[in-house]
Every structure is written in structure tokens, then in C-alpha cells.
Amino acid sequence: MAGAKEIKTKIASVKNTQKITSAMEMVAASKMRRAQERMAASRPYAESMRKVIGHVAQGSLEYKHPYLEVREAKRVGYIVVATDRGLCGGLNVNLFKKVVADVKSWKEQGAEFEFCPIGARSVQFFKSFGGQVSAQASGLGDAPKLNDLIGTVQVMLEAYNEGKLDRLYVVFNKFVNTMTQTPVIEQLLPLPKSEDDEVAHRWDYIYEPDPKALLDTLLVRYVESQVYQGVVENIASEQAARMVAMKAATDNAGTLIDDLQLVYNKARQAAITQELSEIVSGASAV
């Protein structure tokens, strides 16, 4: 059994770690609330944009935008949103597993692929994973702006415009609640048709000044908004996962301290018993 002094040192070390994880839990909780507010503010716009674009994809237009045309998938692009920092449980690992599984299914169909990682962990993973990394972004902070992403997204859009990509997806962790964050893969291009029941009405739109000018701008804004929403959702997911992970670490540290305290008490008791035995033996000898 380790000595009482050594055990006491371990207890002090674990207590220091517990203070750190507890502080990180509180910081993550605060950041999560702010991230949720930003996510809630941008989500209605992103969902409305997705719905409108879905109806446009179903409509009969005199101008057929290239983003509406489905072509054979020879090369697939992924915009993968992960975190800049760790200590957030299995958030990034689960996301990467989902991407790898999807890449494998496309690979079996003979398709090639390229990536646009967003977040330091995503950049690190895909540089070692293999496949072309066409663009990347990291260090966006806890409150990114749309302008921070436009250049990165534009690289992938240009590749699609030039026929170098036939499919484009965005991958991120969707925030469900504090305890649940789900990795999702959403198709950006070609535009997915709306699954909304309202599509049965076959909405008809009047375009001013003309369909081409409007759609050329609108569809690019759509892709940018969906990627931005993915980044905002992922930040909220990151803070929630980190808060839960740090709470678990704090609780585990408390359990470990209790166990070490018990061992310390036993060691201390054994030392006292030994000292008493030595005193009694010495007295008997006299």
C-alpha cells in the first residue's frame, strides 16, 4: 500500500484537476447559452431558405440553373464542420466516422472525393485521412460571421461550377438538446427537392428582374446560409458536449478523491497501529 504522504499528494493533485474541470464546465455552460441564442436566431432563416429552394427545385422554370441539374456522381465534395478544440467527448470522432462511412459507400460506386474541412480538428483529420483538401478554415471563434466562410465555400462552388464536383455535402453536428448532438450529412448540390407536404401545391414564382439574375444570386446565398447554419449548430453542439464531458470529469474526480481518502485513512490507521505496537513492544521489553 502506498504511503500516507504519497496518497495525500495524489488527493491534492486530483482536487486541483477537479477545480479546472468544474471551471471549464461553467464556462462551457455560459458559452452554450450564447451559442444557442445565435443558433435559434439563424435557424428560421436557414430553414425558410431551404424550404423556398426546395419548392424552386420542384418548379417548372424557363431557366434551368446548373445547381438544379442532377448529373452522374463521379466526384463528391464534403464540407466537414468540426471543432477547433478538444475535450468535447466523442463529438468529432462520431462525426468523422459518419463521413468515412459515406465516403466508403461512394467509393464503392467508383466516385472520387475531396474535402473542405472547417475547424482545426477537421483540418488535422482530413490531411491525414487522404483525399484532396481543396480549402480549409479554422480559428473562427465562438461567434463566427458569414463573411468568415464565404471564401472557403466559394472554392467548393467554383469546383462544382467547373464540373470538378458532381455532389456537394455539408457535414456537422446538429444540436438537438444539451445531452444529444447528432452528426448529419446534408446535400447542398444539386439542390435537393423539398420533402414538405406543401410541395403538392406546386408553388409558382414570378421572378424580377429575370430568373437567371435572381437564381444566380439566390442559390449561392442558399449554400452559404446552410454552411453557416451548420457551423453555428456545431458550435452549440461543441459547448454542450464539452459541458457534459467536464461535468462527468468533475464527478469522476470526486469519486476518485473519495476512494483515495478511504485508502489514505486506512494507511494512516495502519501507521498508527504500527506505532502503538512498537510502543507496547518497547514497554514490555523494559
UniProtKB/Swiss-Prot annotation:
SUPFAM superfamilies with a match to the protein in the record: ATP synthase (F1-ATPase), gamma subunit
InterPro entries according to UniProt: ATP_synth_F1_ATPase_gsu (IPR035968), ATP_synth_F1_gsu (IPR000131), ATP_synth_F1_gsu_CS (IPR023632)
UniProt keyword list: ATP synthesis, Cell inner membrane, Cell membrane, CF(1), Hydrogen ion transport, Ion transport, Membrane, Transport
Q: Which Gene3D superfamilies match?
A: 3.40.1380.10, ATP synthase, gamma subunit, helix hairpin domain
Recorded topology in the membrane: Peripheral membrane protein
Q: Which GO terms describe its cellular component?
A: plasma membrane; proton-transporting ATP synthase complex
Give any GO molecular function from the UniProt entry. proton-transporting ATP synthase activity, rotational mechanism
Q: Name one Pfam family in it.
A: ATP-synt
- Record GO biological process: proton motive force-driven ATP synthesis; proton motive force-driven plasma membrane ATP synthesis
Q: Where in the cell is it found?
A: Cell inner membrane
Q: Which PANTHER family match?
A: ATP SYNTHASE GAMMA CHAIN (PTHR11693), ATP SYNTHASE SUBUNIT GAMMA, MITOCHONDRIAL (PTHR11693:SF22)
Complex formation: F-type ATPases have 2 components, CF(1) - the catalytic core - and CF(0) - the membrane proton channel. CF(1) has five subunits: alpha(3), beta(3), gamma(1), delta(1), epsilon(1). CF(0) has three main subunits: a, b and c.
Could you tell me what this protein does?
Produces ATP from ADP in the presence of a proton gradient across the membrane. The gamma chain is believed to be important in regulating ATPase activity and the flow of protons through the CF(0) complex.
What family does this chain come from, according to its entry? Belongs to the ATPase gamma chain family.
Please report the name of this protein according to its UniProt entry. Answer: ATP synthase gamma chain
Taxonomic source organism:
Shewanella oneidensis (strain ATCC 700550 / JCM 31522 / CIP 106686 / LMG 19005 / NCIMB 14063 / MR-1)
**Taxonomic lineage of this organism?**
Bacteria, Pseudomonadati, Pseudomonadota, Gammaproteobacteria, Alteromonadales
Instruction: Give the gene name.
Output: atpG
